[in-house]
Amino acid sequence: MNQSATKKTSKMVIVLNKIKTYFSKPQNIILLLFGIVLTFTTVAPIVAIVEDTFKIHPGTMDAHLTGKASGYSVANYVDLFTSKLARTNLWTPLLNTVLLAVFTCLISILFGGLFAFLITRTNLKCKKYLSSIFIFPYIMPQWTLAVVWQNVFNSNAVTGTSNGLLASLFNITMPKWWCLGLFPSAVVLGLHYAPFAYILIGGIFRNMDANLEEAATILDTPKWKTMFRITLPMVKPAILSTILLVFGSAMGSYPVPHYLGLTTLSTKYISMNSKYTGEASILAIIMMIFGVAILLMNQMSLKSRKNYTTVTGKSGQISKINLGKVGKYLIAVILIVITFFTSIFPILSFALETFLPNPGDYSFLYTMDSSALTTKWWLTDNNGAGALYGQPGILHNPLIWRAFKGTMLVAVCCALIAGTIGTLIGYAVSKNRRSKWA
């Protein structure tokens, strides 16, 4: 009896010592705390949304279909997938959402990846300016580029709205597929996320070991083979991370499809949420399933990726591709023009719109009459002049100032919280790479 009791006591002491040792390291405490918090904040909303898909909501379509005011039913699933409106409420928005996400990934990775390659691996001119200005679209909200697209290409004849710059100045009316729908939405989102691809892929290009490429050059390996067999596999993690984040963000994007007239799962969710609450929750579940699937594929791909190791030290110089005497200037000029329209022109366009007496009234550009411009949207200090349809101008409007203060407060708080949590989790994970918690 004494021996068995002694063994149990010794085992308890060992367990307690292990627990004490585990919690003596701050990274373990951080992992445990954030593991619990993140699990709860991730699982709880999913459970709530799944429950909402079966729940009967008073005054909505599921209550009408079941004849009940409360309880649970599968009527939402049956109606969404099999009713006459299934094509309008589910299949068309789903197809548009997937196509939008795919095209956004292609545009952002091709544009951002090519830009990263030119900046980091060639003798291109104006690199500092281009690398700085290229980030602007990612800093600006999504809807800014969408509104600029409207301001430039919309026309009363095609979209039924006020004329944009092209229609007002040159009487050019772009086709409807150019102004509204999948094409402009994919282009705008692709341009918005291209800087993100540039940051990730460019970081890999800057820090990658050039020894393998140098070895391929010494062995007289063709350039295309070096690119596809060495360079691309080394930037594969950055490309996959870009696909994951861009695809998920594009799937859930609401402002751009809303402004550019594309029906997606996110826009359909907003329109259905009042009368088709349960069915709208099913749309949210579908979007989450896509996100989880992309995440799993990314994890599987990263686990199976090849590791490249050299027996020497890291090369001190990354080989640069010579674009030629003319090419390095010509490509730089082309990129400067492109970045002007994606980064600087949106700011100028918004500034110009604030001085127009009416939306789409660009008459001062061909009359050169500055009196056609107005500052009423900024400086009107009373409600009678109709500066903001019965409200004072921006600088005298208390609602605008309260909104500005609220926006800044939310932005600062989110930055501090996200930065702190991200730093703590990054520290803990880097210290426990082999841990299951990490």
Residue ranges and their predicted role:
Residues 70, 74-77, 133, 162-166, ...:
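Amphipathic alpha-helical segments in well-structured domains
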Residues 219-220, 233:
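Glycine/proline-centered hinge or cleavage motifs at structural transition points of membrane proteins
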Residues 58-70, 222, 306-322, 358-385:
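Juxtamembrane inter-helical linkers in multi-pass membrane proteins
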Residues 62-66, 154, 251-275, 314, ...:
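Glycine-rich helix-loop "coupling/hinge" segments at transmembrane-helix boundaries
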Residues 1-33, 125, 300-337:
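Transmembrane alpha-helical segments of polytopic membrane transport and secretion proteins
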Residues 73, 201-214, 223, 235, ...:
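Transmembrane helix boundary and interhelical loop/hinge segments in multi-pass membrane proteins
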Residues 26-63, 78, 82-205, 234-254, ...:
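Membrane-water interface segments at the C-terminal ends of transmembrane alpha-helices
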